[in-house]
Amino acid sequence: MQARANARSARRRAREFALQGVYAWLLRGGEGTQDAGEIDAHLRDAEDFSEADAQWFKTLLHGVLREAPVLRERFLPYIDRPLAELSPVEHGILLIGSFELMHHVEVPYKVAINEAVELAKSFGGTDGFKFVNGVLDKLAADVRTAEVQAAPRR
């Protein structure tokens, strides 16, 4: 039971490592993809990287860094403050969540949002998860309209 309670899926671990990479990239200025290989290699050297889905990590990290300007453009209308005022953690989580919503329709929108919320609970500020949930929920309604409308309401 203890092992199950502490276990996280390989995809969740991949998202956690991707967030660390996006965070490092944002701290370096958050422009271009020239640092992607170095960030990727550094994170793969982490002791517990073997617990992560390496392919999903690569997809997320490199995809987010490549698509960041477009991703930001899509979530900007839904944030309640200037982009510069977002913490690097919230910014990184929104980039990852937006990337999943926009480029990976095989991941159900509720899963993409929930995974981003879990990242925010683990790594973000006190109520950061509420902010992330609200922004990604609005983005999902825009980019996954049919899926959101077809989902049963609680």
UniProtKB/Swiss-Prot annotation:
Keyword Methyltransferase: no
GO molecular function per UniProt: RNA binding
Pfam families on file: NusB (PF01029)
Entry superkingdom: Bacteria
InterPro entries (UniProt xref): NusB-like_sf, NusB_fam, NusB_RsmB_TIM44
Any one Gene Ontology cellular component term annotated for this protein: cytosol
Gene3D superfamilies: NusB-like
Any GO BP annotation: DNA-templated transcription termination
Classification via HAMAP family: NusB
Name of the protein in question: Transcription antitermination protein NusB
